[in-house]
Amino acid sequence: MWRHVAADLAADHTVICPDLRGYGASDKPAGPDVDLYAKRTMAADVVALARALGHERFALAGHDRGALVAFRAGLDHPDVVTQLACLDVLPTLDMWQVPRGTSAAVGFHLYLMAHPPGLPEKMIGAAPDTFFGHFLDIWGGRPDPMPAEIRAAYLAACRGAVPSIVADYRASATVDVEHDQVDREAGARLGMPVTVIQQDW
């Protein structure tokens, strides 16, 4: 999805574009531990990867799920994240409070994947290309479709990761809410320069 932006940035920046835990080529741990896909855990993954690649401090940008991870990294690792960009996502607490009435239909997948294990995995797993393809279609925003080989690779990666993708979204309705509520009540703030870009749904 971000291949062109990454290539442009790489002309004069070091660019690291990892698949988040549970997505693409990254590990997909399974189990009942609610912290497996907590954004706190995933943020620690990103920081550990950057450090392993020799970057003790870095600017961080994330889109959608990646923005939730980036936001958490900024809160948990303010000594590491020097600048932060969050694109196209509401903070976790707001994500559950802002959508109302029929306008919430755009986020139907959030509510589906918030359910306990079983039903979401079965429903999405029964037609993963239709489910994930729906989002590719509505997120495209352009009349020319995504190249067929890119679409096929994206769908194949999602098809093989249904349980971990659902676990990531489920964490956003459980443990991530707890973490963010504690931080909000404690008055935690992002101390680095922050850019937020949100499209109009």
Positions of PLM-derived features:
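The serine-hydrolase catalytic nucleophile loop
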Residues: M1-A6
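Flexible "cap/lid" subdomain of the alpha/beta-hydrolase fold that forms the substrate-access gate
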Residues: I16, Y23-A61, R65-W201
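Active-site machinery of serine-nucleophile hydrolases
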Residues: L9-L20
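A generic structural signal for short, solvent-exposed coil/turn residues
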Residues: A7-L9, A188
